[in-house]
């Protein structure tokens, strides 16, 4: 189970995936998500300034946030993310070198995987949680099927998770879910409609809690 000095990622505690187009919006996005109850936030490193944004959010927002770096592709990126203050690491695929760096630094790793072989490999290598990606096409039934022979592995469906299916993923046995564009909506962000983002975050938190 993912543990950290500030706490741990709880079951059914949704993880927001933030992909930034504008560095200046990082704090506002994070603040709006936090106001809606989402305290675990992953900044995808697809933007070259994502680590700078993560550090900025850490400086300016309350300490009850758990901020991580996503799309970590190798050990070098993992070390850079940790140096920038990332409190957990997320990979899009099973990348053992990233898991090793995270474990050595005492930083939780959500390792990407899809097939049962990859899922078991990530877990045995030391991943704290296993991110099942892409999960949308496979659906909740896939999570249930995988957990049949592999019970006890904390799975985090990612990719294609939305308000319509997040409860079903959890009912199928997922530990929690990670949510990208269906939460951090590009149109909402473009228009800077932060109250709308907060309300959407609240809806996801409620859906996860009551599923």
Feature locations, PLM:
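Glycine-rich phosphate-binding active-site loops on the catalytic face of alpha/beta enzymes
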Residues: 88-98, 132-140, 172-194
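Short, ordered loop/turn segments at secondary-structure junctions
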Residues: 45-48, 72, 94-96, 114-115, ...
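Shared catalytic-loop signature of beta/alpha-barrel
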Residues: 121, 142-144, 148-156
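Conserved N-terminal glycine/acidic-rich loop preference
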Residues: 16, 81, 119, 135, ...
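Conserved N-terminal beta1-alpha1 strand-loop-helix module at the mouth
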Residues: 1-85, 94, 104, 152, ...
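Histidine/lysine/aspartate-rich catalytic loop segments that bind and position anionic ligands
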Residues: 88, 92-137
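Short, charged, surface-exposed secondary-structure boundary motifs
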Residues: 98-102, 120-125, 140-143, 166-167, ...
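Hydrophobic faces of well-ordered beta-strands that scaffold small-molecule active sites
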Residues: 13-18, 41-43, 67-70, 89-90, ...
